[in-house]
């Protein structure tokens, strides 16, 4: 069972992103404030769940959270400010939209750019440790998956309904054959041939 909070006396928002390592598409982030007594034994890191479980849990989170929101940063913005800053910006945009102002942010990962005057704590593999971060990971993942499924209808060659924009062999083969789209991140190592273009984390 994941932990319900880091500090019971503060309004905490868990934050996570999806799509950082993709070659195409926006990066999504979510922020979620759960009730302190929220319990769900299935809720875990979205990568550990089936697609069906993720969407079922999304409904529960949206229904039972005190507040939740999703932030998006486009491929053009990613190319302009780099993917790490874009991930932070997506989280900031999600927090911006929360109908309740949190007093503390729980961030998945080991780095974060401070949001206004709010204190934050970074938690490595936080989506497997805290309920609010796990909930945010599910919202970010499912909303981004919905977006990539829509893009797939426009550009079916790239298999985005399956790979969601990640660098699979089929995705890179399609880039070689058909070129790039307006949704590809042009600063990324799209063909996997130039290691100097990889962005270090």
From Swiss-Prot:
Signal peptide: none annotated. GO terms for molecular function: manganese ion binding; RNA binding; RNA-DNA hybrid ribonuclease activity. Keywords: Cytoplasm, Endonuclease, Hydrolase, Manganese, Metal-binding, Nuclease. Its main location: cytoplasm. It is found in: Cytoplasm. Its EC number is 3.1.26.4. Its cofactor is Mn(2+); Mg(2+). A divalent metal cation binds at residues 16-17, 108. Manganese or magnesium. Binds 1 divalent metal ion per monomer in the absence of substrate. May bind a second metal ion after substrate binding. Transmembrane segments: none annotated. NCBIfam families: PRK00015.1-3. This is Ribonuclease HII. It comes from Phocaeicola vulgatus (strain ATCC 8482 / DSM 1447 / JCM 5826 / CCUG 4940 / NBRC 14291 / NCTC 11154).
């Amino acid at each position: 069972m994941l932990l319900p909070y880091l500090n019971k006396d503060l309004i905490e928002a868990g934050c996570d992103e999806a799509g950082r390592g993709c070659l195409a598409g926006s990066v999504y982030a979510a922020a979620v404030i759960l009730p302190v007594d929220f319990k769900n034994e299935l809720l875990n890191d979205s990568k550990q769940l089936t697609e069906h479980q993720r969407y079922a849990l999304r409904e529960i989170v949206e229904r039972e959270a005190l507040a939740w929101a999703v932030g998006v940063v486009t491929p053009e913005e990613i190319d302009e400010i780099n993917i790490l800053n874009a991930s932070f910006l997506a989280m900031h945009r999600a927090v911006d939209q929360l109908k309740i102002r949190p007093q503390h942010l729980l961030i998945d990962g080991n780095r974060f750019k401070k949001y206004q005057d709010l204190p934050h704590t970074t938690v490595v593999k936080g989506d497997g440790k805290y309920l609010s971060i796990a909930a945010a990971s599910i919202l970010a993942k499912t909303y981004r998956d919905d977006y990539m499924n829509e893009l797939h209808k426009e550009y079916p060659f790239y298999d985005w309904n399956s790979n969601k924009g990640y660098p699979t062999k089929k995705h890179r083969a399609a880039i070689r054959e058909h070129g790039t789209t307006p949704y590809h991140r042009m600063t990324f190592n799209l063909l996997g041939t130039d290691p100097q273009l990889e962005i270090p984390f």
